[in-house]
Structures are given as C-alpha cells and as structure tokens.
C-alpha cells in the first residue's frame, strides 16, 4: 500500500504537524443523503480506506470504478486544545464539493476539485477524542464542475481516464498561535536585488513580522514590519544576488517570525530570483533567450490514479524527462501537488500551470463564477514558484456537440483576471484553440507525415501555420507548438495514439528525432511540448510505460535526448 509521509506544503513549513494520511473509515453515499441519515453524528462507517488515495484507485483498498456522486470519511483524533492556540485541519485536494464536520458540527465547506483548503476546527474540538467526518460530492458529468481528464462515461476511452472522487491528496493537522501567517506572495526584483513580500496574517491585535533571507546558510538580508491588519508588505534588499535559472537553480531560504501577545509563529520558506520577459518572438529568463523543450505530463500514477504512491515519484518523473533532454513540462489538465513544484524549483525544471477545464461548459453564459474562484486559488497557491513560467487556464475549447462555439467573453475575462493577479508571467488563454487574447500563440500539431511537417515549418518565414484558420488570428505573438508527436509505440493493438504507428524502432526513432529537428530549426518557434512522457491507461503514446518502465534501450534514449537537446535557432542572439 502507498504511503505519503513528507510535509505537503514545502513553501510554508512549520516544525509541528500531524500527518493524517493512512487508514480512515469510509462509505459510499450514492443517494447524497449522508446528512439526512445522520452520518456526521454516527459513531462509525463500514469500510476502510487508505487516504489520500481516491476510492477508485487500487491503493485506496476500495477500487470502485463506477460513478459515485458522493462518499463519506471518518477518523478519530486525539486533540488537546490550548488557550491562545488554533488547530488547523488541512486538505491538499478533494473532488469536488467537500464539507467537514467535527463532533457533528460543520466547520466549513470548499467548492472545487483541485486546490487546497484549510478549516480552523478549534471551536468545535474537545479535549480527548474527536470525531472528524468528511463528505465529498462530485460528478464529472456536471458541466459546472471542471473535471479534467476524468471520463464522463462508465469506462476510460481515448484520452479520457479513470475518475477520481473524494480525497486524493494529503490531509494533515497543525497547531498555530492565535496570530499566525496564512500565506505570502513573493515577487523577485533581480534588477534591484530585492525580494518584495506581501504577507497574509490571521488573528486580532498588533503583529510584528520579521523576514530574513539566507543563501547557503548565510544571512543576506532582512526586513521587519508591524500592523494591526491582516496583511503586511515588506522588501528585503539582498547583499548577495544569485539568480535562479534552469542551468543553476539557486534557491534562497526565507525565515519568517510573526510575534504577538499569543506567541510566535515561525515558518520556513524559500524563493528564487529570476525574471521572465517576452521579447519579440522569444521568451527570456534573466535576459537569456530560452527554447522550451517541454514534455506533456498528465499527473496520473497507475495504482494511485491522481495520487503518487510516494513523495519520491515527483522527482523521479522530472528526472525521467530530463534524461530525455526536456527542460520542462506542461502540467496538463489538473493542478499538480505542491511537492512536484518544489522538486521542479530545486531541479530548474520549467513548468506551465494549467487547470482541469475539460468537462466544464465553456460555451454557456454565466459560467465565470463556476470557474474563476478555483482558478485564482490555484494561481495564489503557486505564484511563488520560480520554476513556473506561465499560466494556461483552458485547453482546446472545442465547439459543443450541438455546434455552439466557445464563449469568447469567458476566455477574455479569465485572461484579464490572470494578468491582473500575476503580471509577471505570460498567459495562454486557451491552449491550441481557439485563441481570443493571448501572450503566446500556441498550436497543437499531431501531423505524423515528416514531409508535410517540413513543408509546413520550412515556409514559416513567409506564412505562419495556423491550425484553425478562420477561428483565431495570429497577431505576431511568440509562437509555440505546445502539443506534437504523440507517436504510438505499443504491443497492444487497442492502445490509442496519433496517426499510424511506426512499424519498426528505427522508423519510430527517425520520426521522433526529425520532428524535434524541424521545430528547433525554425527561428520563430519559442518552444515545443512533446506528447507525452508516459502512457496513461489506454493512451499509449508515451516514451515510458504507465508504470514508468522505459520502452526503449539506453542507446535509443540517448539518440532521442541528443535530438531534443540540439541547439535551437531561437536561442541564438
């Protein structure tokens, strides 16, 4: 059985915490009647589940693959509430609508399937044994609920996969003083050698906050500020400036102390100093042109579905991608766990932040309120990560089955909100199609005919290739091929992929390497993203199998990596 043991929130760490992953009581709630049946007040549930794995997964111990509109969890906790202390119950993610009860009393509800949430359970907690009940409701067939690649049919099909209901990410408990740090926005200013901080606080009364930055254990700057409000701004001038880049991903440590009458809240964090700029056809990091050699990573983990079996899986996937010459990934159609982004920060592995927009009705009016709240939660969660170089809230906003087009106003409003919340990174409004307003013009091109690809991109200087002419217009933005390849390579004839599968390994290798060479040779292409790193269920066009075993020998992978790492035209100054 899988185990998740590491602290789930590496960018805001407290020494004292309690991991609640492991065995919980569980039951289905097919009729969504748990509240009416008094389940929050009930003593026990019939089944056992291994949290944080969803009930559809093998690792959960349940393995129920049919639709379930709701499910219920219970756990007994020994607590010792103290005067001047607060008890926070934290969930990294649960699909889709989650209500939490402590000793039969509702302490909060979260709507959304992909972002973390926290409830202060102090006032409902008792000294001694406490009963925690969690009710999760979600249906990927509900078009107001973004559900990503979760299948809306009974079985998986094509590029739609097994569903994920209820809790699927770590659950944990921490105690804090009455006055504590809720979060921070860290904005690097490399030109001024400063870190600008906006901290969010909880609790009443006067608060004094000290921030201190460290590089390799040496103090390199500090700032202090006081407030009676719930947020505070500060700026640290750095005596030593070491930039974060893919080649040298330097990270600073950041110590934060919040002092008040209730005591001290001490938090450890980190940051990277880097700047992203768009310059004509290219992107720059710290003034240097970059060519994005990305791979599509869908965040599926076999026996755990949405959930990695152990915390080391995140770094291992990054290392698999780097082994093949990729310098980053599209984190596709879901919000990845924070520990993945932490490993990306440490490795200098570039990522794009996406959202699980599939399953959501992007054609109807009045849908912004269903989409924007959780999208902005995801942005706030991941804003501080130096490895994250761009946002992409939508992917392939196709016409509805009845022919209705996407709601352009929805995409424009989400783009505008994204740029308002984070003007430091580029935003792609909807990857592939149909662009309304975008910082980077990206397309998806699964052409398998090499001669056709040559014709398409060799003539690029004269005429830009648009994959959806008449529905979107190229206006001179940086140009990116954010999905290509998808070459099927499998012994399973039922496996799904793009185009005709190569008949021999040499044919596969020739196609793979030539695709990479054609795109890298074009001086107007700022990046590519190969589909995909590993197979996912029946979609068998990955470079690795679903269990992450390699499909190819070392010599073949070396040739693939060499083709991907070859210098790109856009990298030349």
Where are the regions that the model predicts?
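Beta-strand-rich binding/interaction modules
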Residues: 100-102, 193-226, 232-236, 254
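Short, aromatic- and glycine-rich surface loops/edge beta-strands on solvent-exposed regions
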Residues: 131-134, 248-260
């Amino acid at each position: 059985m899988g185990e998740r043991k590491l602290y789930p929130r590496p960018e805001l760490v407290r020494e004292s915490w309690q991991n609640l992953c492991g065995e919980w009581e569980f039951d289905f709630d097919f009729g969504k009647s748990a509240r009416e049946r008094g389940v929050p007040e009930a003593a026990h549930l019939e089944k056992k589940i291994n949290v944080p794995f969803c009930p559809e997964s093998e690792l959960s111990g349940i393995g129920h693959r049919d639709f379930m509109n709701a499910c219920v969890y219970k756990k007994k906790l020994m607590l010792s509430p103290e005067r001047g202390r607060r008890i926070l119950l934290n969930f990294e993610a649960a699909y889709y609508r989650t209500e939490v009860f402590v000793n039969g009393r509702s302490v909060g509800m979260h709507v959304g399937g992909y972002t973390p949430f926290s409830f202060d359970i102090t006032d409902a907690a008792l000294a001694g044994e406490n009963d925690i009940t969690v009710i999760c409701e979600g249906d990927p067939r509900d078009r107001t609920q973004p559900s990503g690649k979760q299948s809306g049919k009974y079985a998986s099909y094509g590029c739609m996969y097994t569903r994920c209901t209820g809790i699927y990410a770590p659950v944990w408990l921490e105690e804090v003083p009455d006055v504590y740090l809720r979060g921070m926005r860290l904005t690097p200013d490399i030109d001024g050698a400063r870190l600008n901080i906006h901290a969010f606080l909880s609790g009443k009364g006067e608060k004094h906050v000290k921030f201190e930055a460290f590089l390799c254990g040496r103090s390199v700057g500090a700032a202090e500020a006081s407030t009676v409000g719930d947020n505070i701004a500060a700026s640290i001038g750095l005596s030593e400036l070491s930039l974060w880049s893919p080649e040298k991903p330097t990270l600073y440590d950041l110590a934060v102390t919040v002092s008040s009458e209730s005591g001290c809240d001490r938090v450890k964090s980190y940051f990277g100093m880097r700047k992203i700029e768009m310059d004509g056809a290219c992107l720059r990091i710290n003034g240097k042109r970059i060519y994005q050699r990305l791979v599509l990573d869908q965040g599926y983990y076999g026996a755990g579905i949405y959930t990695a079996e152990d915390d080391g899986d995140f770094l291992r996937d990054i290392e698999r991608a780097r082994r093949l010459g990729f310098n980053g990934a599209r984190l596709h159609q879901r919000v990845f766990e924070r520990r993945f982004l932490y490993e990306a920060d440490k490795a200098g592995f570039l990522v794009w932040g996406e959202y699980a927009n599939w399953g959501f009705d992007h054609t109807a009016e009045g849908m912004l309120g269903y989409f924007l709240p959780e999208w902005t939660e995801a942005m706030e969660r991941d804003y501080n990560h130096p490895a994250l170089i761009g946002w992409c809230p939508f992917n392939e906003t196709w016409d509805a089955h009845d022919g209705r087009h996407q709601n352009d106003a929805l995409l424009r409003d989400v783009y505008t909100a994204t740029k308002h919340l984070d003007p430091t990174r580029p935003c792609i409004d909807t990857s592939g199609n149909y662009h309304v307003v975008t910082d980077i013009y990206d397309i998806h091109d699964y052409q398998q005919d090499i001669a056709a690809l040559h014709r398409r991109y060799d003539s690029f200087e004269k005429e830009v290739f648009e994959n959806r002419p008449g529905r979107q217009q190229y206006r001179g933005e940086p140009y990116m091929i954010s999905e290509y390849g998808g070459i099927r390579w499998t012994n399973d004839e039922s496996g799904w992929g793009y185009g005709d599968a190569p008949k021999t390994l040499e044919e596969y290798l020739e196609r793979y390497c030539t695709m990479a060479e054609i795109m890298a040779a074009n001086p107007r292409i700022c990046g590519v993203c190969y589909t995909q790193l590993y197979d996912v269920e029946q979609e068998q066009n990955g470079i690795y199998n679903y269990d992450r075993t390699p499909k190819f020998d070392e010599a073949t992978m070396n040739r693939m990596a060499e083709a991907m790492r070859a210098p790109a035209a856009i990298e030349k100054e």
